[in-house]
Regions:
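Membrane-interface helix-loop-helix junctions at boundaries between adjacent transmembrane segments
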Residues: 1-63, 78-94
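Membrane-interface interhelical loops and short amphipathic "cap" helices
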Residues: 8-10, 39-57, 81-88, 109-125, ...
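Hydrophobic alpha-helical transmembrane segments in multi-pass integral membrane proteins
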Residues: 34, 103-112, 170-181, 208-213, ...
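Internal/C-terminal transmembrane anchor helices
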Residues: 222-248
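Soluble catalytic regions of membrane-associated enzymes that act on cell-envelope
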Residues: 246-297
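Membrane-embedded alpha-helical segments of integral membrane proteins
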Residues: 161-218
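Alpha-helical transmembrane segments of polytopic membrane proteins
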Residues: 22, 53-68, 122-135, 192-205, ...
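Hydrophobic cores of alpha-helical transmembrane segments in multi-pass inner/ER membrane proteins
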Residues: 1-2, 25-32, 61-77, 101-103, ...
Length: 297
């Protein structure tokens, strides 16, 4: 386990550096956008509307955004000491917030049987919120326990409480799956829902990985974080590569699902969302619409 932790430590450090660099670059991008807007407003006030119109062009905004974000990445990657200091500061803040976050999740689970699941799905945001909560929990646990090789960051009683709270992660995964399945049963597959299932699967595997670490090592479960994260990290890379390759084209899969709804009579031709095919499924959707148009008497 110690060998795994020592080999995992550089991966952990680089991952958090990249995360902080990305966040700082996004903040730099936000500042650049405000500067561009001020620029356009100032010149517009003196009767020069060229820049206001220029900043409304998609190609120009995309170019400026890419250059600003890329410039931020270049600058902040060179400030390693600053980035590491920010990472340590964030880790300290998250260390204070994690117990409160776990209390919130425990109270939520206790309240859920009294409110029922129906109200959770009423706004169509319940699944997303549960997945976001699971991601934040996993992120905070990693930020606090890091490689798992250091000494316990909490008093023993609080560490045991956090250990027990890890068993809530599979519960949130199960609730998220229920919400996803309900939407799929009603509206079939879309590109967004495929990505939602991919994200759910990744979060679910990490959740069960940590629970298995608790079952195997009990209170010493952080020592297995390096192994769990390394193995599942490779899985995440493989899934992302497949998801962006012809082997797992979500547009074609979504098209097949939507067309099956139409041909099976699950949805009438009048209620069929042809705009989704046209606007979201790119060329496969366009070709399918052409075929439907040719078949229409």
């Amino acid at each position: 386990v110690s060998d795994d932790a020592s080999g995992y430590e550089p991966l952990f450090i680089f991952s958090w550096r990249n995360l902080v660099v990305g966040a700082l670059s996004l903040a730099f991008l936000g500042g650049a956008i405000l500067m561009y807007l001020l620029w356009a407003a100032l010149f517009n006030e003196i009767g020069i509307g060229f820049f206001k119109e220029l900043f409304r062009k998609v190609w120009f905004v995309t170019l400026l955004g890419a250059l600003s974000f890329g410039g931020g990445v270049i600058v902040f990657r060179g400030l390693t000491d600053v980035v590491d200091s920010i990472s340590r500061l964030l880790s300290g803040i998250i260390k204070l917030l994690l117990p409160f976050l776990l209390v919130m999740t425990a109270v939520f689970l206790v309240a859920l049987p009294f409110t029922g699941l129906e109200i959770l799905w009423a706004t169509n945001q319940g699944t997303m919120l549960l997945m976001v909560l699971t991601f934040i929990l996993l992120l905070c646990i990693n930020a606090v326990y890091q490689t798992g090789a250091a000494e316990n960051p909490y008093p023993l009683w609080l560490h045991h409480a956090i250990t027990g709270a890890l068993f809530t992660l599979p519960i949130f995964s199960a609730l998220s799956f229920y919400g996803l399945y309900a939407r799929l049963d009603q509206y079939a597959w879309t590109v967004v829902r495929y990505w939602a299932v991919v994200i759910w699967l990744i979060l679910c595997l990490f959740s069960f990985g940590y629970v298995l670490a608790v079952i195997k090592c009990r209170a010493a479960w952080p020592t297995m974080m390096a192994s769990v994260n390394s193995i599942l990290g490779v899985f995440v890379i493989v899934v992302l590569l497949l998801s962006n390759s012809p082997l797992l084209d979500f547009r074609k899969l979504s098209l097949a699902s939507q067309m099956h709804r139409l041909t099976s009579g699950a949805v009438s031709p009048e209620d069929f969302d042809d705009q989704y095919l046209r606007n979201e499924l790119a060329r496969p959707g366009y070709l399918a619409l052409q075929e439907l148009t040719a078949q229409d008497p």
